[in-house]
């Protein structure tokens, strides 16, 4: 299980099948107002792009790119931190971020066994950017395991897919659900994928924006605003042990990547604190 939160601070098209978001059906989470898009792209400068790969009977995966700031991130790195909630994963680039407290590339999310090819592609993309010389580079790539529906051993995500996600990145609405790195993932025993939201603090508290993007792939007992939805629908982790009805479920397994961005002027030390609170927010979902 990997639960990683990547925090950033600095001063596309819709999914194939458009579905209502939580607030569209009257489910309002929290007390603060959302940004205009209710997405991580409400934080000025943040762009998100997806590339979805569906091939044959066994490839269901993709890449999601988060570009956290305009310009060349290598020559103009921004404060960042990676907070690990549970460290069973194959993330690339963590140690340097935790040493220097800054990020120098975009972030790529993909499937577990694609992280190395994705990191190589991100490296190649960075060296094509204006102002890059011959330097070492610390690509940031996170992952979740989508092997229930995806043959990740075929290494379906590489140069072309990562380049497409990066080059398609925009500051507009963010496609959610079975798209990009969320194509083959699940949550709480149902289909999961990519999700995003944002909140804006009142002017008296600085007026800052906080945006989140997640790649879900985990189990639990789904709660929506405190309502025990998973329990009521009898679809939750460890159900087969509590109410024996066979062993056809693996809802207790999984992972999640959480990317948090803000325009609040926070240091890497305080971004770590934000990451801890993001894990608390995850716990509230069940």
Predicted regions and their residues:
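Alpha/propeptide regions of enzymes that mature by internal proteolysis
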Residues: 16-286
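Sec/Tat signal peptide C-region and signal peptidase I cleavage site
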Residues: 11-15
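Bacterial N-terminal signal peptides
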Residues: 1-9
């Amino acid at each position: 299980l990997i639960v990683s939160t990547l925090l950033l601070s600095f001063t596309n098209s819709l999914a194939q099948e458009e579905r209502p978001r939580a607030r569209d059906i009257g489910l309002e989470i929290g007390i603060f107002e959302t940004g205009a898009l209710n997405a991580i792209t409400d934080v000025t400068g943040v762009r998100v792009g997806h590339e979805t790969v569906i091939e044959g009977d066994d490839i269901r995966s993709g890449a999601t790119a988060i570009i956290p700031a305009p310009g060349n991130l290598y020559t103009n790195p921004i404060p960042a931190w990676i907070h690990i909630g549970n460290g069973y994963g194959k993330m690339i680039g963590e140690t340097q971020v935790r040493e220097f407290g800054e990020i120098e590339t975009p972030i790529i999310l993909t499937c577990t066994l694609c992280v190395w090819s994705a990191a190589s592609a991100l490296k190649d993309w960075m060296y094509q950017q204006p102002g890059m010389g011959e330097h070492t580079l610390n690509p940031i790539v996170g992952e979740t395991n989508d092997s229930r529906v995806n043959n990740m051993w075929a290494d379906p995500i590489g140069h072309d897919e990562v380049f497409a996600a990066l080059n398609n990145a925009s500051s507009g609405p963010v496609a959610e659900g079975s798209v990009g790195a969320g194509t083959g993932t699940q949550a709480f025993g149902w289909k999961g994928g990519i999700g995003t939201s944002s909140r804006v603090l009142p002017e008296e508290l600085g007026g800052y924006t906080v945006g989140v993007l997640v790649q879900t792939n985990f189990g639990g007992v789904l709660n929506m605003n405190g309502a025990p939805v998973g329990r009521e629908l009898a679809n939750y982790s460890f159900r087969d042990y509590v109410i024996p009805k066979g062993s056809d479920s693996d809802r207790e397994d999984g992972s999640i990547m959480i990317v948090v961005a803000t325009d609040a002027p926070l240091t890497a030390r305080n971004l770590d604190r934000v990451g801890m609170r993001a894990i608390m927010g995850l716990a509230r979902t069940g």
